[in-house]
Amino acid sequence: MKKKAFNFKLISTSGVVIELKKIKSKFVVLYFYPKDDTSGCTIETNDFNKLYNKFKKHDCMIFGVSKDSLESHKKWSKKLKLKFDLLSDEKKISLKGYKVWTKKKFMGREFMGTVRSTFVIEKKNIIKEWRNVKAIGHAKEVLNFVENY
């Protein structure tokens, strides 16, 4: 399953503009999540953070992406002591590019929101994607894929 990854330029919590096509590492993990500092998103982000060094051994960069502001990302990143950057996409450019900004239903109400999704990218191609994932255990599943690719 190889398809061209959507290129983007987004500001990171380290203050650097990240452009996908300029990243030199072998793998990039982009995980999209609904909202900073919420229970499921905290579980998923903490799990990626705990496994960060194992991803790094495989020349893999991790980026968490949401529509939250850079200021929100910075506070949350500091709180969780993240070893990787979060990317702010307030204009929803990458969220729409990866088709994770979509209509959702909750308690009979419809609204637009981010579907928790992850993409592994190699040489500007998507080699694996997960959509509508459960937060618990997902980071380990992504690491298993990278380790065995």
Model-derived regions: residue spans:
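Chalcogenol-based redox active-site neighborhoods
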Residues: 1-149
